[in-house]
Amino acid sequence: MTDGTSQYIDAKMPTMPEEASMHADTNRPDAIACLETDEDASAHARTSQERMSASGRSLSPRWLRIVSIIWSGQAVSIITSGASGWAIIWHVTQTEQSALMLSLLMMFSMLPLGLLSPLGGVVADRFNRKAVMIVADLGAGASSLVLALLVVAGTRSFALICLFATIRSVFSAFHAPAMTAAMPMLVPERHLLRINTLDQLLESISSICAPAVGIALYTAFGLAPTLIIEFIGALVACAALGLVKIPTVKVEEESTVAEQMRVGWDALRVHKGLVMLLGGLTVGLMAFAALGAIYPLMATQHFGADGTMVSVAEAISGTCMLVGSIVIMAWGGGRRLALLLCASAVLIAVPIIAAGLLPSTAFWIYAGLMGLASVFMAWFNGPLMTLIQQRVPEEKTGRAMGFFYALIGLAMPAGIAVGGVIAEWIGIPTFFVASGILFLVIGLFGYLFKDIRALDAPSQASKAPL
């Protein structure tokens, strides 16, 4: 093909018609060939990308079937576990009649996830992630079965229930990093946020169904049969995992657990924007956990709602979070995930601030506003999870996600404890307004930082080496 200079000279110099015709004939095929080559290269790039998983592995043509099998088993496990958890809560409510005891139970159910998830991430990167998930599911299910047998034998002390709640949370600390580290190896990058949102979707379904199912099963059959149902759900999840193949990552050289944890943190720290978003997410989850804990008090003390009204309002919030999860799964979240996270914080803030300013006669408006906040809360942590999976090498993803779940596991009980004290001090409606302003600051100012905006740049799509 002729270069740009000769084309310019040819255009300026007079030519005979025959020469012009001959010149055009020699240039046209080259131009067409160049365009065809560019189009072929672009099509080849798109095809190659579609054949690769988010972690850069060759993608199985049956990837959707594999993921569907895994998540079908997890769906059964999440719903049966949620029903069992509510049966335990109802049992403690009826037998102990103490808010302190319920708070302790919740603390034992959350803290191990926060404290042990970094270790769970090390295990997820060291061993086959499918095996880690199966052992974790079996361990959690077996602990419920043992507790059921002890209840049948007549042993049902509060201390024993807290012990088994702790054990279940320990197994969750190993299951969660392995699960989220496995997904990028199985799913195309453009569908990764959708798959990550499945967990939120199932949790939303569980939050709607589990209280009614768990309390109904407890009332009809007692605590032990409900715990056995959770064990059956764990077996279903393990059976589903047994039907699929999950690749094994390359194991690094032997090193201490502390050194391996540090490698996971360094994999996050190399992207300053990820660390900043993790900080914002942690603060936001602390605020939202506190709002969830005082939600019934706001309803009863400020609006004078009864138990039925509170139950309906809780169902509205759960349904709206389900709707938010479905929307993000259908949409896919777009390419600018850091912007999506910051925008969702703003969209969460507005209804929460409005809810704190309502008069005491506007309960149903309050329920609607909190439902609206729940829609956008479903968009809050999925983008960050996806950004971590996209940017951290697959052999370090488990450890990176371990820190992600550690922050979540610690943020929620810390938020409940600190938020309760602050709400007592400044008043519950004022606390709602303050929490909304906090979300507003996270959203509006977060995206002003260059390191956070850089996460949405095309050049950041590849995983940076350490």
Please annotate each region the language model reported.
Residues I89-T95, A148-A153, C209-I229, Q301-H302, ...:
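Transmembrane alpha-helix termini and helix-breaking/packing motifs in multi-pass membrane transporters
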Residues A181, M185, L227, F231-T256, ...:
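Helix-loop junctions on the cytosolic side of multi-pass membrane transporters
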Residues G56-L111, D266, V270-S317:
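Helix-loop boundary and gating motifs at the non-cytosolic
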